């Protein structure tokens, strides 16, 4: 084989290796830290919640996401090792409860880990690091939407209020970055604030503006005034 043939073969092999590596690497641009307001989740759910809710925003999930194109999901088949959760359980049950089924918190964490957490490498190392990261963000770093709103004297009293007031309060608590909102009509056809998402860069080092919310006109978009 001549030099030209060897060069061609080397190029083909190298290209194949690059293709294999790139196909096995899942990309993401940023993280969404989504929190759900427990009463609104239950009010908008077709099946009523069995247990009383706390008037708190608690964690829905931490999701690797993309500005353009689909968000990565289920990147590995690694299950959550519930035997290792140990002394994190008490904190997680408070800040990350399964609102719809409080008898199965672990099942909720595992669902979030498999669907989203497995796609967070290298920022998220493994299942326990995923849970530890959520605890750190919500408690240590005070990325707690209820606390942020309370600091701005916005309390969950079930009244309608301008969405811009809620946004401005959250901006003050997140270095003036834009959050994302999800709203939904409850059984009384009142539109409630169901979720607030705080966005961070792909290394979870700093807040960023959330790129986009639900499309205008969708059933999850928020009007100018919402109940909270």
UniProtKB/Swiss-Prot annotation:
Single GO term (MF): RNA binding
Active site residues according to the UniProt entry: 60 (proton donor), 112, 116 (proton acceptor)
Its job: Self-incompatibility (SI) is the inherited ability of a flowering plant to prevent self-fertilization by discriminating between self and non-self pollen during pollination. In many species, self-incompatibility is controlled by the single, multiallelic locus S.
Pfam families associated with the record: Ribonuclease_T2 (PF00445)
Post-translational modification: N-linked core structure at Asn-87 and Asn-101 contains xylose and fucose or consists of disaccharide (GlcNAc-GlcNAc). N-linked core structure at Asn-144 contains xylose.
Cystine crosslinks: 42-49, 75-119, 183-222, 199-210
Enzyme Commission code(s) on record: 4.6.1.19
Name under which the protein is recorded: Ribonuclease S-1
GO cellular component: extracellular region
GO terms, biological process: RNA catabolic process
Catalytic activity: a ribonucleotidyl-ribonucleotide-RNA + H2O = a 3'-end 3'-phospho-ribonucleotide-RNA + a 5'-end dephospho-ribonucleoside-RNA + H(+)
Sites where the protein binds RNA: 36, 60, 98-99, 108, 111-112, 115-116
Keywords per UniProt: Disulfide bond, Endonuclease, Glycoprotein, Hydrolase, Lyase, Nuclease, Signal
Organism domain of life: Eukaryota
Membership in a protein family: Belongs to the RNase T2 family.
Glycosylation sites: 87, 101, 144, 157, 175
Enzyme class: lyase
Signal sequence interval, chain numbering: 1-27
């Amino acid at each position: 084989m001549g030099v030209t043939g060897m060069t061609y073969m080397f190029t083909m092999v190298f290209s194949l290796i690059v293709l294999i590596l790139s196909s096995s690497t899942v990309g993401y641009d940023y993280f969404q830290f989504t929190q759900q307001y427990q009463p609104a989740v239950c009010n908008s759910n077709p099946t009523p919640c069995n247990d009383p809710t706390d008037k708190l925003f608690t964690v829905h999930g931490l999701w690797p996401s993309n500005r353009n194109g689909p968000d990565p999901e289920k990147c590995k088949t690694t299950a959550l090792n519930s035997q290792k959760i140990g002394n994190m359980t008490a904190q997680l049950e408070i800040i990350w409860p399964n609102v719809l089924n409080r008898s199965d918190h672990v099942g909720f964490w595992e669902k979030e880990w498999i669907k989203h957490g497995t796609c967070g490498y290298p920022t998220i190392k493994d299942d326990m690091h995923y849970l530890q990261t959520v605890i750190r963000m919500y408690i240590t770093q005070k990325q707690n939407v209820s606390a942020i709103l309370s600091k701005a004297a916005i309390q969950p009293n079930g009244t309608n209020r301008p969405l811009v007031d809620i946004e401005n309060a959250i901006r003050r608590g997140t270095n003036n970055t834009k959050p994302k909102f999800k709203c939904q009509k409850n059984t009384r056809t009142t539109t409630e604030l169901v979720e607030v998402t705080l966005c961070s860069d792909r290394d979870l080092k700093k807040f960023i503006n959330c790129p986009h919310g639900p499309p205008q006109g969708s059933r999850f978009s928020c009007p100018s005034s919402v109940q909270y």
